[in-house]
Amino acid sequence: MESPIFILITLSFFLQSVLASSQTLSNSSTICKTTPDPKYCKSVFPHSQGNVQQYGCFSIRKSLSQSRKFIRTVDRYIKRNAHLSQPAVIRALQDCRFLAGLTMDYLLTSFETVNDTSAKTSFKPLSFPKADDIQTLLSAALTNEQTCLEGLTTAASYSATWTVRTGVALPLVNDTKLLGVSLALFTKGWVPKKKKRAGFAWAQPRSGSSTHTKPFRLFRNGALPLKMTEKTKAVYESLSRRKLADGDSNGDGDDGSMVLISDIVTVSQDGTGNFTNITAAVAAAPNNTDGSAGFFLIYVTAGIYEEYISIAKNKRYMMMIGDGINQTVVTGNRSVVDGWTTFNSATFAVTAPNFVAVNITFRNTAGPEKHQAVALRSGADFSIFYSCSFEAYQDTLYTHSLRQFYRECDVYGTVDFIFGNAAVVFQNCNLYPRKPMPNQFNAITAQGRSDPNQNTGTSIQNCTIKPADDLVSSNYTVKTYLGRPWKEYSRTVYMQSYIDGFVEPVGWREWNGDFALSTLYYAEYNNTGPGSNTTNRVTWPGYHVINSTDAANFTVTGLFIEADWIWKTGVPYTSGLIS
């Protein structure tokens, strides 16, 4: 039975359709033509006229209601099947419960925002950044539901008699369709038209700005301009063995570019810190901070930390700094072969917004024979990884959702080793395909954009793509590709990067026959190196060699609209194309 508030929203839908004379009124058949599934869309709405904003509010609210129902269903199945001998089944349901909770948060924020724009007689447009925020949340909500569905489908194959397929997975299919409708109507009704061009993100230019900019800090120095109290500073200096001068900002002084630290705890395996493991330090961090007092810093000294760490959504504004790549190492060995879902195989997982990691190695040692085994998964909005390394084989780095930035990082893997559906930029990184099992190939990326209205994609800018040492010395031939389309609207761009000659001349590989070859968006711009020649590249309809105008859509300010969240961390970045 629908809640009273949902009934109220439904009545409001009819009243607003009468009063909104300043908006273009249409019936559901007309409105639904703009959605991915018009037939399903028409089955959702009342048979009355309204404008796209009213239909959008209605569908987002209904998505929220369905999300609540789904959580109750999952809870019931977890309780009912707690005795099952197949751990993958329970883990898939637990993933779904976790993801559904996040989806509810995203939908509630989205509904409150769009509902505030719809007055009785007029419509108030959203700013460019606010529209991008909501499109990002709806895109992530859709990704969450599809991640759940994939996990359930895989888990259900373990038992032919298990009812999860009909009891949980099938209802979720319709919920996913409804979210696609909500995202499509939001994109049509609220996202500025210029931003919607070809589904690209668009950045409103700042005064005097250019699409070509220079990085403002040195490549790979791994140090941030931190500002902290004398007490906190003494703790940091004693462990890091790095003296922080007053106004430590490369000589710039405290000009607003310093990174404010609210407090610090330390992790050291020899007992000289506050904690001997990272998990305990994370638990000690404050909950739901707004960042106004700065970042909560966890300093992790050198050591091999065999832990599975999850940074929950309430641990906002956390910064974790290690002693360097291959010095501070977080390692695990979970894999799909051993009964974990891909989602929860991650050694390190982060959901909390505004998370920053510096000078840390994240590793999964399961090995190529264990197939999917994630080193790090990020579904954290505004998450940043600076001077870190990620080491595994298949599915090393899961850039799951929301907005992410990687600077001066090393990523090692084999099959689909950078995958997911975030809006993510890799800058000045090193991507190292390594030796897979015999008869396997390497695919650097497997981007998971499943809907044309998702503002997601993978941008690889000013990076170096070279073979890892074990691939160079391999005693059998291995083919390496820039990527393959995991989902129908997969979107990946390589630009201004060095591509070594070991990459196959065709560049890209099919996923399965002609799947997604017309709907994907793969592009290359101004790359160098013996593997960058596009003469013999694939001839798919979705593959492009682009110019600087199109490439600018995949820079930091193109994909993210605003970059203040990066600037406030002190992490260096290039906002546009490199001159």
UniProtKB/Swiss-Prot annotation:
* BP GO annotations: cell wall modification; pectin catabolic process
Report one GO cellular component. Answer: extracellular region
| Glycosylated sites | 27, 115, 174, 274, 277, 287, 326, 333, 359, 462, 475, 526, 533, 547, 553
Q: What is its EC number?
A: 3.1.1.11
Which chemical reaction does it catalyze?
[(1->4)-alpha-D-galacturonosyl methyl ester](n) + n H2O = [(1->4)-alpha-D-galacturonosyl](n) + n methanol + n H(+)
Instruction: Give the matching SMART domains.
Output: PMEI (SM00856)
Q: Name one GO molecular function term.
A: pectinesterase activity
Which cellular compartments is it found in? Answer: Secreted, Cell wall
Annotated PANTHER family: PECTINESTERASE
What biological function has been recorded for the protein in this entry? Acts in the modification of cell walls via demethylesterification of cell wall pectin.
Q: Can you tell me which family this protein belongs to?
A: In the N-terminal section; belongs to the PMEI family.
Q: What is this protein called?
A: Probable pectinesterase/pectinesterase inhibitor 7
What organism is recorded for this protein?
Arabidopsis thaliana (Mouse-ear cress)
**What taxonomic ancestry is recorded?**
Eukaryota, Viridiplantae, Streptophyta, Embryophyta, Tracheophyta
Source gene? PME7
